[in-house]
């Protein structure tokens, strides 16, 4: 397969940051680390940034503060105590969380520190009530070997997760406290990844090490993968929230494409002779041009007493509409910046459109005194809001002349990315004074190192050898994190081949029909218990799981009863087979054992899920032989 880019020539550098929730108690309070929809109380806060010890303010924190938002927190008495309301000093940290992180460190060839010191990382988007996140380095200097070469893991950290967002409004954000404080392991690599597929290999290896502990949470939102991507002449861009492993190569490829196109735009702007200082912060009121406009957005704004303001972007015509990622343009980047104040912008390269006529476009060009290569951007809002939005556009336009801006971006489902905020600075960390340093005795390190869990690939090989199941089944069990449940079922007497087949083949087969994520491990345990007690046939699993996926509040026993899936006695099975045989007696007399397939099919149509297939086959064979 031909690659889209020569990544070596482009000097691609990628670093990973992987965050995974640990399945222990909360990090600084002995409350369960679970999520809930039950809300017992609410309170509100406003947050502001503080200077670091060097008198600096983190730019990302400052930008968040400028939004002037109020934060409302929803809490539950069982899952949120005074520690996470920031009304009481932290306790802990949780020893199990610390031990699991040390296991992960050894699995990734890292060296644990002798003493753990927690720090405070400034976060004032409201996701931490205190305005900071507690984090500590647990190990240093790990590595992952890949076919492309080794990738370093400079740090493995243990930190607390943030609140869960419920609703975001213009001047108010509602958070739920339940997720705040769940232990989170953060693993950072060096930027020694030079190919998109290499990034996927490294992420998978780290994910395997995490899952090997069997103490990480599963499900949506429990793992977050961030990428740091740069190319020669470009800039370091942090891409947050990559959910799927398979999306990593595409997201990197799209970021390379974006940076290359931004560099081409930079070169063209320089050829046109434009400099950042040529873009003036001058706002033109062009409301009169749109007095009788057909644009619904603009007409609605003017009717409310708003304005239409414009800025002039010298020598930008034809470049704002230039595609930089599939379906995204430089104008999209400008709009992303402006969206903290307005819903969108209009620019010359996309007009006439959206109800704006050519006559109106020409009137704006004339009013601004634009030359042939000059562009404009419009915003419809109240005057102050419009100016704030256009200042963001001006800032992004100036950055376009410089090349690729350093920033934090959000991963989108299609592989593209979207602006989130400036890249965080270093002025956001300071010591945590409420938690004493924690000494890790050498004997504790040795104990953990001597009892490391097996890695997923080792587990796959063991399953094939010990349980004699197909390798692809074993790999799917491990990759889908059903391996622990599989071993539990086998210990209870379920045949390994049946347990693996139900957990992999049956559940995967239902994925396109029903939401199988609603089927819990307890549902599965109960269904297998019914089977081992002889109450259901193995053919009943599919029907039971299908119903449980749609109605997870039900039990497996309840579904089996409602759907008539409980096993019939041997006498009842024989009676139904006798009926089928009598209905087809002439065919049996004519074909003898040649009628076996037909009779078996008709019998199973009546008995599927209510009788064991082997028993039905034995009885049908006997009945046919008696008549032949």
Swiss-Prot record:
Matches recorded under NCBIfam families: gatE_arch, PRK04028.1
Pfam families: GAD, GatB_N, GatB_Yqey
Role noted for this protein: Allows the formation of correctly charged Gln-tRNA(Gln) through the transamidation of misacylated Glu-tRNA(Gln) in organisms which lack glutaminyl-tRNA synthetase. The reaction takes place in the presence of glutamine and ATP through an activated gamma-phospho-Glu-tRNA(Gln). The GatDE system is specific for glutamate and does not act on aspartate.
UniProt keyword ATP-binding, yes or no: yes
Domain of life: Archaea
Family to which this protein belongs: Belongs to the GatB/GatE family. GatE subfamily.
Subunit structure: Heterodimer of GatD and GatE.
Record's catalysed reaction(s): L-glutamyl-tRNA(Gln) + L-glutamine + ATP + H2O = L-glutaminyl-tRNA(Gln) + L-glutamate + ADP + phosphate + H(+)
GO molecular function: aminoacyl-tRNA ligase activity; ATP binding; glutaminyl-tRNA synthase (glutamine-hydrolyzing) activity
Native species: Thermococcus gammatolerans (strain DSM 15229 / JCM 11827 / EJ3)
EC annotation from Swiss-Prot or TrEMBL: 6.3.5.-
GO biological process terms on file: glutaminyl-tRNAGln biosynthesis via transamidation; translation
Protein's name according to its UniProt entry: Glutamyl-tRNA(Gln) amidotransferase subunit E
Lineage of the organism: Archaea, Methanobacteriati, Methanobacteriota, Thermococci, Thermococcales
InterPro entries the record matches: Asn/Gln-tRNA_amidoTrfase_suB/E, Asn/Gln-tRNA_Trfase_suB/E_cat, Asn/Gln_amidotransferase, Asn/Gln_tRNA_amidoTrase-B-like, GAD-like_sf, GAD_dom, GatB_C_1, GatB_Yqey_C_2
The keyword Hydrolase is assigned to this record: no
Any one GO CC term of the record: cytoplasm
Keyword line: ATP-binding, Ligase, Nucleotide-binding, Protein biosynthesis
Gene name for this UniProt entry: gatE
